[in-house]
């Protein structure tokens, strides 16, 4: 089972709100997911990002692949840097 960390769209028309979820890559965008690890609100100024860092690092360590947008969010939060350092054993 290929697992991805991606955004699940919530909110009303023209006002997107996203949940950062871990899901099987074959399930639909807004379909079944394994675990919710955060939220992303692009409408707020500045955009609000809340991510459970421990859960994100756990799933990245287990081989989950983040989508491009989630990778950018993780990089801005410093999660990708921590993941790469832990992979190198530092």
Curated annotation (Swiss-Prot):
**One of this protein's Pfam families, by short name?**
Ribosomal_S16
Query: What does the UniProt keyword field contain?
Result: Ribonucleoprotein, Ribosomal protein
Q: Which residues form the signal peptide?
A: none
Entry GO MF terms: structural constituent of ribosome
Q: Does the keyword Transcription regulation apply?
A: no
Q: Write down the superkingdom of origin.
A: Bacteria
Which is a GO BP term held by this UniProt record? translation
What InterPro entries does this protein's entry cite?
Answer: Ribosomal_bS16 (IPR000307), Ribosomal_bS16_CS (IPR020592), Ribosomal_bS16_dom_sf (IPR023803)
Q: Name one GO cellular component term.
A: cytoplasm
Regions annotated as coiled coil: none
Q: List the disulfide bonds.
A: none
PANTHER family registered for this protein in UniProt: 30S RIBOSOMAL PROTEIN S16, SMALL RIBOSOMAL SUBUNIT PROTEIN BS16M
The record's family statement is:
Belongs to the bacterial ribosomal protein bS16 family.
Listed name of the protein: Small ribosomal subunit protein bS16
Source organism per UniProt = Bacillus cereus (strain G9842)
